[in-house]
From Swiss-Prot:
Keywords: Electron transport, Heme, Iron, Metal-binding, Periplasm, Sulfate respiration, Transport. Residues 1-23 are annotated as: Disordered. It comes from Nitratidesulfovibrio vulgaris (Desulfovibrio vulgaris). GO terms for molecular function: metal ion binding. Heme binds at H23. Binds 4 heme groups per subunit. This is Cytochrome c3-1.
Length: 23
């Protein structure tokens, strides 16, 4: 996955049930 903006990279992952950072 390509680096995203902080706001876009920060999302709620339903599978992990937590907040994940897409770097």
């Amino acid at each position: 996955a390509a680096p995203k903006a902080p706001a876009d990279g920060l999302k709620m992952d339903k599978t992990k049930q937590x907040v994940v950072f897409n770097h």
